[in-house]
Amino acid sequence: MARNGSARSDGPALAVHGGAGRERGGERAARRAGVARAAEAGWGVLAAGGSALDAVIEAVAVLENDPHFNAGFGSVLTEDGRVELDASVMEGTGLRAGAVGAVTSVANPVRLARAVLDEGREVLLVGAPAATLARRHGLQRVAAEALVTPAARRRWERRDEAPGETVGAVARDARGAVAAATSTGGLAGKRRGRVGDSAVIGAGTYADDRVGAGSATGPGEAIIRIGLVRVALDHLAAARSATAAARSALAVLQARLGASAGLVLTDARGRLGVARTTPSMPVAVRRVGAARALLVD
C-alpha cells in the first residue's frame, strides 16, 4: 500500500526526503530532526526570494553533512571500503541539469552537480573529471577517508548489505520556477564505478516548470529502468493531486519490477505530494503560512 502525505499549496513550497527503506534502531528521531533542519535551510532561501534551484541544493547539502543519511559524510561503503557519491540537480525553466557519479573526495556532491549545470557543457560527469571540476569551482574537497564514519566502517566490516538510501528535495519558488536535487552514497557493498538513479536525469531527478519536479529514492537499477520521476510527472497531468501521481508511479514500479521506493513531487503550482511503498521515508515539507517544517511519514 502506498503511504503518503499530501500538501495543498500555492506559491513557494518545499519538500525534503531522507531516503526510503527500513530504518535501523534508534535512527528515527535523528533522521526526522535532520530532514526538518534541511527543510528550514531550503525554506530560508525561498523566504528571502531565492530560487527553487538554490533552495533544493541548500536543503540537500544539509543532509550530505549529516552522518545519519546515506549521502556525503557517512555514506555506505563500496565492496573495497570506499565512499563513492552520486548526485544530480535540475531546474525546470530552461531544463538545465547537472549530475555527477562515483565521486570520492567532494564533501557536497550536490554542489558539484550544480557546477556541472552552471558550466552547461555536459549533463553527467563521472569520477576524476568531476573532481577536476570541483577544484575549478573552489568546492570543498576532502580526503576520501574523511567521508567514512566509524559506523559506516563497522557496517562494512560486518558486510551489512542493507539497501542504500537517498536524500533529495523539490521546490517551487515565488516566480513559479521548480527544481529538484538528489544525492546518495549508493548501495552498501557496491562495485566501484557503479552509478545509480540519483545521477540519472529522468530516473531519480527531474524538473519542468510546465509540469512539476520530483526526487526519487529506492533501488537504483529498477528506478532507472522505469524512469520513475518522469513516469510520476507524466501522471501529474491526469492525477487529482501530486500525491496521487506519486502513488501511480510507484504502482507501476511495483507491478513491472516488483520494487518498492519513495517519491516527493511538486506540481507546477507548488502543491506537494509524498508517497512510499517502503517501511519508512522521513520527509519534511514547508509551505507559505507555516511556522515550521511539517514532518510526514
Predicted regions and their residues:
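Alpha/propeptide regions of enzymes that mature by internal proteolysis
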Residues: 1-297
